């Protein structure tokens, strides 16, 4: 029992009282601490607090229903030592492992079994991290001087920098002589018909006091008889509508 040195508190579970004092003295000398005793048949009625002992020594291992109780009675990393047992070591070690003990082993020379309580208290919880988070890029520390900006001039070819030919900017039906379609529905046919009617106006009896009537509405007086008509060449005959130069009343 030299492996149990410097343990403060131990529990000895006995079946034969004939060697009780001798066993207790041996445990005291090996551990150097206090030793409590308990009968194996009274163990189920005991009321020991959890994590009370550093070592529990059992003389007879007929405790199938009490291994879990012993696990609670031991402190974290506490030892369980069986010095006498009934049954095969393999079956006992399996029962002990299923009760929560670890590092279970057999000493065939001494005919003993030893197990250990995990280094944490029964029922303890710990947070598990199954994946490591990748370190994020600290964008605030990126210097703007390191950015390579594209020069807009490099995106233009020599052909893009040449000025276009005005003759190539003409759009069909918007320059030159206007002509309405056969089935015109945009109003161009009516507009051209109105211009033809207006351009044929007779200005033989009309006289201009300012001499600027032919230039267009921008140069005409408010009472000009040609107001609203398109510009015309000097001396060109322009026919006025019949309702012009007549009072509305």
From Swiss-Prot:
Annotated localization: Cytoplasm; Mitochondrion intermembrane space
Region (N-terminal SAM-like domain): 1-130
Binding site for [2Fe-2S] cluster: 172, 181, 184, 186
Top-level taxon: Eukaryota
Organism: Drosophila grimshawi (Hawaiian fruit fly)
GO biological process: iron-sulfur cluster assembly
A GO CC annotation given for this chain: mitochondrial intermembrane space
Domain remark from Swiss-Prot or TrEMBL: The C-terminal domain binds 2 Fe-S clusters but is otherwise mostly in an intrinsically disordered conformation.
Subunit description: Monomer.
Binding site for [4Fe-4S] cluster: 210, 213, 221, 224
PANTHER family tied to this protein: ANAMORSIN
Location of the region described as Fe-S binding site A in the Swiss-Prot/TrEMBL record: 172-186
Primary localization class, coarse: cytoplasm
Region described as Fe-S binding site B: 210-224
Name of the encoding gene: CIAPIN1
Protein name: Anamorsin homolog
Reported function: Component of the cytosolic iron-sulfur (Fe-S) protein assembly (CIA) machinery. Required for the maturation of extramitochondrial Fe-S proteins. Part of an electron transfer chain functioning in an early step of cytosolic Fe-S biogenesis, facilitating the de novo assembly of a [4Fe-4S] cluster on the cytosolic Fe-S scaffold complex. Electrons are transferred from NADPH via a FAD- and FMN-containing diflavin oxidoreductase.
Entries under Pfam families matching the protein: Anamorsin_N, CIAPIN1
Keywords: 2Fe-2S, 4Fe-4S, Cytoplasm, Iron, Iron-sulfur, Metal-binding, Mitochondrion
Stated family: Belongs to the anamorsin family.
Region called Linker, residue ranges: 131-161
């Amino acid at each position: 029992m030299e492996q149990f040195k410097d343990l403060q508190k131990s529990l000895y579970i006995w079946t034969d009282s004939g060697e009780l004092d001798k066993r207790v003295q041996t445990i005291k000398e090996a551990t150097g601490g206090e030793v409590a005793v308990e009968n194996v048949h009274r163990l189920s009625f005991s009321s020991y607090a959890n994590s009370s002992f550093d070592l529990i020594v059992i003389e007879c291992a007929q405790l199938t229903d009490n291994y879990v109780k012993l696990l609670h009675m031991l402190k974290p990393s506490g030892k369980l030592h069986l010095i006498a047992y009934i049954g095969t070591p393999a079956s006992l070690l399996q029962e002990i492992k299923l009760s929560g003990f670890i590092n279970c082993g057999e000493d065939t020379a001494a005919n003993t079994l030893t197990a250990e309580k995990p280094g944490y208290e029964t029922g303890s919880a710990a947070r598990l991290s199954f994946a490591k988070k990748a370190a994020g890029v600290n964008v605030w520390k990126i210097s703007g001087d390191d950015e390579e900006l594209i020069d807009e001039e490099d995106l233009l070819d020599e052909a893009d920098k040449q000025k276009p030919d005005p003759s190539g900017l003409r759009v069909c039906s918007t320059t030159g002589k206007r002509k309405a379609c056969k089935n015109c529905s945009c109003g161009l046919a009516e507009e051209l018909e109105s211009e033809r009617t207006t351009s044929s106006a007779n200005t033989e009896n009309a006289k201009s006091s300012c001499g600027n009537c032919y230039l267009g509405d921008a140069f005409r007086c408010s009472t000009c008889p040609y107001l609203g008509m398109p510009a015309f060449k000097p001396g060109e005959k322009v026919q006025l509508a019949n309702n012009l130069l007549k009072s509305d009343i």
